[in-house]
Amino acid sequence: MIFHKNIVKAEFIRRPNRFQAYVKLNGSEVMVHVPNTGRCREILLPETTILLREENGINRKTKYDLIAGYKENKLINIDSQIPNKVVEEALENRKISYFTKYNKIEREKTFGNSRFDFKLSGDENLKCYVEVKGVTLEKEGVAMFPDAPTERGRKHLLELIEVKKSGMDAAVLFLIQMKDVKYFRPHDEMDKKFGEALRHAKENYVQVVAYDCDVGENFIILRDEIKVQL
């Protein structure tokens, strides 16, 4: 997907809470919104070059969203609203081999007590619920999720098992918001219960897949399937 809004570079200073950060822009300290409640500690370091997207909402307190940061020479998108849009574009273009048998895409559909990012439908009553998780954490070429404990994420996995037991297909797709990673694995050191739930989901025939992305200053596109190591 292409970003059509104005994108500018700045320098990260600090992040006092999950929703706000201070950056240096054109020599001045500016408060910006952070559209990601994860920690992003490996990316948002003092003096790191980051990208801001200009926003013009009437009721906004800030003019910019902090959407990406450079980790050495690697640009990593951190906007939590982006993964679903990237995956939807890839689904529409039939770029994800697991889902090419489905021809109808519905967003934000409920099953049981959970709302999933996508419900896919195809011929012969084929149906699949898909949950997308955006991945921003990378260490030594290994992409991991989550970067903060997520009880909600664990519950999604358990509900996907129920989807599968009901006779429909179920999948979780980890969208790695960068390129050049070796493989993906659950971040057990941060959230052991999530890792256990992911392995349990796989054992119960929930599809677990990961894709990386080409990320530029004004675009992000789903790229290649990445090995999942559980």
Curated annotation (Swiss-Prot):
GO terms for molecular function: DNA binding. Coiled coil: none annotated. InterPro entries: SfsA, SfsA_C, SfsA_N. Pfam families: SfsA, SfsA_N. CDD domains: SfsA-like_bacterial (cd22359). PANTHER family: SUGAR FERMENTATION STIMULATION PROTEIN A (PTHR30545:SF2). HAMAP family: SfsA (MF_00095). Belongs to the SfsA family. This is Sugar fermentation stimulation protein homolog. It comes from Clostridium kluyveri (strain ATCC 8527 / DSM 555 / NBRC 12016 / NCIMB 10680 / K1). The gene is sfsA.
